[in-house]
Amino acid sequence: MEREIMARLAKWKDSPDRKPLLITGVRQCGKTYVIKEFGNRYFEDVAYFYFEGNKGLASIFDYDLEPERIIKELGSIVRGKEITPGKTLVIFDEIQACPKAITSLKYFYENLRELHIVCAGSLLGVSVKRDNVSFPVGKVNRMQMYPMTFPEFLCANGEQELYKGAGRFEPGKELPELYYVPLRKYLKYYYLKLRT
């Protein structure tokens, strides 16, 4: 399934000014899927860490916020496999569940810039205010992710040609039935999926 945000992620990966990336968006909009897919496509290895309900994982950030130590412990103790900057994509999922992990992003930016780190969070703004988290302003890149768009939905259902074909017609003009009928069917299905 191809999402439009994937191209932005690839651009972030190759940016000389890259900072740890924080992707926010509502629950169930596909953040985790997209980030894992991005890692599998563009990196030799993916190190995935899920913070929600995992106090042991969060405790790694209690001692200090030194990136080298954190990455070594995440790799050797939690994961059982070394994390290699430049080759491994590190994913912190539901990062809002570990306020110190959010704060640590500042130090990852300052002291371990060669590491590619992507974080995902839902209701992150609420969590930051509620828990009085020291947010690393200016030390992270941010992207907002939204639920799947109708064009993405068409492509995910194997209808790339229908999407391209309909796109050749001028907006506001009546579509030929050849396009209108299937597009209408998919639009109904799309709206039903959005509600579930």
What positions do the PLM features span?
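Structural recognition of the conserved hydrophobic beta-strand(s) that form the central parallel beta-sheet
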Residues: I91, H116-S122, Q144, F153
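Interdomain motor-coupling "hinge/lid" segment immediately C-terminal to the ATP-binding subdomain
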Residues: V128-T196
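Hydrophobic positions on the alpha1 helix immediately C-terminal to the Walker A/P-loop
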Residues: V34, F38
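Hydrophobic anchor at the beta1->P-loop junction of P-loop NTPases
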Residues: I23
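Sensor-1/coupling segment of RecA-like P-loop NTPase cores
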Residues: E110-N132
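Conserved lysine of the Walker
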Residues: K31
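Pre-Walker A adenine-sensing motif
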Residues: M1-P16
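Short glycine-rich substrate-engagement loop in P-loop NTPases that contacts/grips substrate
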Residues: G53-G86
